[in-house]
Curated annotation (Swiss-Prot):
Catalyzes the oxidation of 5,10-methylenetetrahydrofolate to 5,10-methenyltetrahydrofolate and then the hydrolysis of 5,10-methenyltetrahydrofolate to 10-formyltetrahydrofolate. GO terms for cellular component: cytosol. One of its GO terms (molecular function) is methylenetetrahydrofolate dehydrogenase (NADP+) activity. Belongs to the tetrahydrofolate dehydrogenase/cyclohydrolase family. The lineage of its organism: Bacteria, Pseudomonadati, Pseudomonadota, Gammaproteobacteria, Enterobacterales. Pfam families: THF_DHG_CYH, THF_DHG_CYH_C. SUPFAM superfamilies: Aminoacid dehydrogenase-like, N-terminal domain, NAD(P)-binding Rossmann-fold domains. Its EC number is 1.5.1.5, 3.5.4.9. It comes from Serratia proteamaculans (strain 568). This is Bifunctional protein FolD. Pathway: One-carbon metabolism; tetrahydrofolate interconversion. InterPro entries: Aminoacid_DH-like_N_sf (IPR046346), NAD(P)-bd_dom_sf (IPR036291), THF_DH/CycHdrlase (IPR000672), THF_DH/CycHdrlase_cat_dom (IPR020630), THF_DH/CycHdrlase_CS (IPR020867), THF_DH/CycHdrlase_NAD-bd_dom (IPR020631). One of its GO terms (biological process) is tetrahydrofolate interconversion.
């Protein structure tokens, strides 16, 4: 068996095209373009790359994009004051603060300062709580993007045994909630899990997000499984690989996401979707 590749690049482009068309329709109807503010504190090279891709996506779909590149010496109080201004700004529908933040700034305090209806990353306790209560509003980008991939490939998730490897607040925990909504019997594994192999071998749908290259051996994959690899790891050689041994896993899985070109593009595309949603659901004012 050779797995079918889940092409995140193509699906992400479809999503961006759909959003761009909706933006055109808004402008034709006399409405404003959605606005996204992207805040970067410090000069983390990886963060700069991620932020640049988000800004490019905004330009591509016709959003108003505002960039705030702050020095690493920015205080927590200064960052919170900027968020307060953006919360009150009628042109801004989404506020994204790129993580990680420099030492001395409390991530939790900053993310909770963003108003829930501008929280396009989906990290605010209100939005996480809505997801847990089966009534999601703005959903965390990577999990929502993964669900979109499964939907676009017409993969029926109801009744599947789903296993999430990794329990982070950004991917693993909200992913488990999305999988429950999608009708899966869901297991979350983490660093204290005993006999990880047993759980992986029983997974009809496997989501791996630990940030360790080749962490899941390919021969652990259940034949016919769906494998979603969230990991993005750069080796010393410069090659970018995921958390799953791709070649060996591809021989056993029915579907698999590549790295790069799988989940990564969907995270940015979903951020764009969330910003349009925030604009239309929360902030639209009819033209006079």
């Amino acid at each position: 068996m050779s797995a079918k590749i889940i092409d995140g690049k193509t699906i992400a482009q479809q999503v961006r095209n759909e959003v761009a068309e909706q933006v055109k329709q808004r402008l034709a109807a006399g409405k404003r373009a959605p606005g996204l503010a992207v805040v970067l504190v410090g000069e983390n090279p990886a963060s700069q790359i991620y932020v640049a891709s988000k800004r490019r996506a905004c330009d591509e779909v016709g959003f108003l994009s505002r960039s705030y590149d702050l020095p690493a010496t920015t205080s927590e109080a200064e960052l919170l004051a900027l968020i307060d201004r953006l919360n009150a700004d009628g042109e801004i529908d989404g506020i994204l603060v790129q993580l990680p933040l420099p030492a001395g700034i409390d991530n939790v305090k900053v993310l909770e300062r963003i108003h829930p209806d501008k929280d396009v990353d989906g990290f605010h306790p209100y939005n996480v709580g809505r997801l847990c209560q089966r009534s999601p509003k703005l959903r965390p980008c990577t999990p929502r993007g993964i669900v979109t991939l499964l939907e676009r490939y017409n993969i029926d998730t109801y009744g599947l045994n789903a296993v999430v490897v990794g329990a982070s607040n950004i991917v693993g925990r909200p992913m488990s909630m999305e999988l429950l909504l999608a009708g899966c019997t869901t297991t979350v594994t983490h660093r204290f899990t005993k006999n990880l192999r047993h759980h992986v071998e029983n997974a009809d749908l496997l989501i791996v997000a630990v940030g360790k290259p080749g962490f899941i051996p390919g021969d652990w994959i259940k034949p016919g499984a769906i494998v979603v690899d969230v990991g993005i790891n750069r080796l010393e050689s410069g090659k970018v690989v995921g958390d799953v041994e791709f070649d060996a896993a591809s021989e056993r899985a029915a579907y698999i996401t590549p790295v790069p070109g799988g989940v990564g593009p969907m995270t940015v595309a979903t951020l764009i979707q969330n910003t349009l949603q925030a604009c239309e659901v929360y902030h639209d004012v009819q033209p006079k």
